[in-house]
UniProtKB/Swiss-Prot annotation:
Pfam families: TGF_beta (PF00019), TGFb_propeptide (PF00688). The gene is GDF6. The keyword Secreted applies. Residues 321-333 have a biased composition (Pro residues). Residues 23-350 form a propeptide. This is Growth/differentiation factor 6. Residues 28-98, 247-272, 308-366 are annotated as: Disordered. Residues 1-22 form the signal peptide. Its main location: secreted.
């Protein structure tokens, strides 16, 4: 009973004191002092260089962001240049793969068919009795400073021509496109004239009909006279057009046209501009030459030499690794036998080729001398990077024994008959005569030379037609 009264009295006393203003101010001042104490501690920590400790989860979340490096800028990506590597299937030391001109392909097809029919390609009038035809693609640009185009220059790098070759002809082939707009009223006869650059020498001139729109086609100019005096490094030819029938009408082009003299026609309107042209429509210089037999395979030596000089055994630049091992020595009595050896980078292919085609030579055949098959694949030899066509052909070879008596179809020489007779009497004293080719025929090869020019060449004595004892 006394306890309940004491508790009730305490409650009334507390409520009475809470209503007094002095007690409320004391409580407020105590709470504010605690707040000021907290703020003072915070300011003191800032002055001393210490930041208030944040919650742990915030620190751990922010710490990886502070340590993480900023990502690279997107615009910096294109500035990174990948290491330059030669493209696949490109011959060493060359530029991009050369696309043969359709004109050179047609020459190869025509002369190859003639050879199969037994006709020598050098007898064709178009070949000019040449066994080598080299094509050079125009490297010039349009002269944009002259509008309209009055003169068109054509530049050709002819440094790969050898002074050992006899030059028998040269022609410039220009593709004339159909004009985009019809011609205006004719001002007289229209003539095309071809000059050597920086020279008044007129190589050839021809007339065009100004009445009708010309059809697209090839204009062929004889430039043999312009190529002969050149030092065979670079040939520059210039095409002009003029109104008039005189051969030197184009020379009056530099004069200011009078009231009765129309300006020279625009070569672009005649279809001779370089813009919007396919590779097959570019100007082509075709040189006809006749090579001596001893220099027919000189380009093979150049091909193998340029490949070993430019690229090392590991595919890197020159000097990046140890030099390649020397090629095997040629067989005795065989001149330039190393020309038929594939490049160092093709040795695995050569080994496979030899193991596949050399099994029949393990045992000496006792058959009489006759012609046997021999299939040659230039791709297996490693020459497909510069030989365009053919990639393979049937060469044949001679195999067998020349025993006594010799057959008449073997066409033996008197010396072979005596040698065979001596061998039959005493095999230890005299070796038998040899089974060798007695008649060989040529083949046509289309290839890329060291200057990336497409060349047609007729190679003599490439196919065995008959065998005999010698």
């Amino acid at each position: 009973m006394d306890t309940s009264r004491v508790l009730l009295s305490a409650v009334f006393l507390i409520s009475f004191l809470w209503d007094l203003p002095g007690f409320q101010q004391a409580s407020i001042s105590s709470s504010s002092s605690s707040a000021e104490l907290g703020s003072a501690k915070g300011m003191r920590s800032r002055k001393e260089g210490r930041m208030p400790r944040a919650p742990r989860e915030n620190a751990t979340a922010r710490e990886p962001l502070d340590r993480q490096e900023p990502p690279p800028r997107p615009q910096e990506e294109p500035q990174r240049r990948p290491p330059q590597q030669p493209e696949a299937r490109e011959p060493p030391g060359r530029g991009p793969r050369v696309v043969p001109h359709e004109y050179m392909l047609s020459i190869y097809r025509t002369y190859s068919i003639a050879e199969k029919l037994g006709i020598n390609a050098s007898f064709f009038q178009s070949s000019k009795s040449a066994n080598t035809i080299t094509s050079f693609v125009d490297r010039g640009l349009d002269d944009l400073s002259h509008t309209p185009l009055r003169r068109q220059k054509y530049l050709f790098d002819v440094s790969t021509l050898s002074d050992k070759e006899e030059l028998v002809g040269a022609e410039l082939r220009l593709f004339r496109q159909a004009p985009a707009a019809p011609w205006g009223p004719p001002a007289g006869p229209l003539r095309l004239q071809l000059f050597a650059c920086q020279s008044p020498l007129l190589l050839e001139a021809r007339s065009l009909d100004p009445q009708g729109a010309p059809r697209p086609g090839w204009e062929v100019f004889d430039v043999w006279r312009g190529l002969r005096p050149q030092p065979w490094k670079q040939l520059c030819l210039e095409l002009r057009a003029a109104w008039g029938g005189e051969p030197g009408a184009a020379e009056d082009e530099a004069r200011a046209p009078g009231p009765q003299q129309p300006p020279p026609p625009d070569l672009r309107s005649l279809g001779f501009g370089r813009r919007v042209r396919t590779p097959q429509e570019r100007a082509l210089l075709v040189v006809f030459s006749r090579s001596q037999r001893k220099t027919l395979f000189a380009e093979m030596r150049e091909q193998l030499g340029s490949a070993t000089e430019v690229v090392g055994p590991g595919g890197g630049a020159e000097g990046s690794g140890p030099p390649p091992p020397p090629p095997p020595p040629p067989p005795s009595g065989t001149p330039d036998a190393g020309l038929w050896s594939p490049s160092p980078g093709r040795r695995r292919r050569r080994t496979a080729f030899a193991s596949r085609h050399g099994k029949r030579h393990g045992k000496k055949s006792r058959l009489r001398c006759s012609k046997k098959p021999l299939h040659v694949n230039f791709k297996e030899l490693g020459w497909d990077d510069w030989i365009i066509a053919p990639l393979e052909y049937e060469a044949y070879h001679c195999e067998g024994v020349c025993d006594f008596p010799l057959r008449s179809h073997l066409e033996p020489t008197n010396h072979a008959i005596i040698q065979t007779l001596m061998n039959s009497m005493d095999p230890g004293s005299t070796p038998p005569s040899c089974c060798v080719p007695t008649k060989l025929t040529p083949i046509s090869i289309l290839y890329i030379d060291a200057g990336n020019n497409v060349v047609y060449k007729q190679y003599e004595e490439m196919v065995v037609e008959s065998c005999g004892c010698r």
